[in-house]
Regions:
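Long, contiguous N-terminal structural blocks used for assembly/anchoring
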Residues: 2-173
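Intrinsically disordered, low-complexity regions enriched in Ser/Pro/Gly/Gln/His and often acidic
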Residues: 42, 55, 174, 199, ...
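Short, aromatic/basic amphipathic alpha-helical patches
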Residues: 168-184
Length: 218
């Protein structure tokens, strides 16, 4: 067979349609640039709200920490102005500080309470209006935690007419703890859910050694 005959016997190549190559008509959506997480509200406000209202400087004189050298402060703050520790206990808060906090704290934060203790607002109000006869103890929780807040867990009451009550360790029938608590509760408008878990007569250093009743809720 000749070369000419061999070429003629081969099938012809198919003719492809003339379809132009075009880019796709749709494009994938743009990938959003990463953004910082928003300051979502926590228990009583956005992260750092205690720093913004100046809470930690107000607590500084009342921090429950070891003694410092002259010129030193027991309060350790980071670059944001937040305490280095997320738990900051205080004791002996006076009337002036309590009144200042009533004006600075958000309304929601004033509703805080330590379990069945009086609300923070009731405790601060009692302290602010007692001219030194009522002091507060508690703690602050820093911005490191979701439950950033101020809590009052105890009050110290030094009213002279309340010092004659007898409170016994075993709380026997002769113990007057319930009668004492009712007097304190009614006098200062304390909205506690129950009697304090502990009532002790004390002479704290932060009260200049004056005698008073320390009432604490677990």
């Amino acid at each position: 067979m000749s070369a000419q005959t061999s070429l003629a016997a081969q099938p012809a190549s198919p003719v492809l349609p003339n379809i132009p190559v075009r880019p796709p008509t749709t494009t994938p959506p743009p990938v959003p640039a990463p953004t910082a997480a928003p300051d979502l509200p926590r228990l009583y406000g956005p992260p750092g709200w205690t720093v913004r209202i100046g809470l930690w400087r107000l607590l500084e004189p009342w921090l429950d920490t070891p003694r410092c050298l002259p010129g030193e402060s027991p309060l350790r703050l980071d670059a944001r102005g937040a305490p280095v520790s997320d738990y900051v206990p205080f004791r002996g808060m006076d009337a002036a500080t309590a009144a200042d906090l009533l004006n600075r704290l958000p309304a929601a934060a004033l509703s805080d309470r330590q379990n069945l203790a009086p609300s923070l607002k009731a405790m601060l109000t009692a302290c602010a209006g007692a001219d030194g006869q009522v002091r507060l103890c508690g703690y602050g929780i820093g911005p490191q935690r979701e439950d950033e807040r101020l809590s009052a867990e105890a009050l110290w009451v030094a009213d002279a007419d309340l010092q004659g009550y007898e409170v016994l360790v075993e709380h026997s029938r002769d113990c007057q703890c319930s009668a004492l608590w009712e007097r304190v509760r009614d006098r200062y408008g304390l909205d506690a859910g129950c009697i304090p878990d502990d009532i002790v007569r004390t002479r704290p250093e932060w009260a200049g050694g004056a005698v008073g009743w320390w009432m604490w809720w677990d």
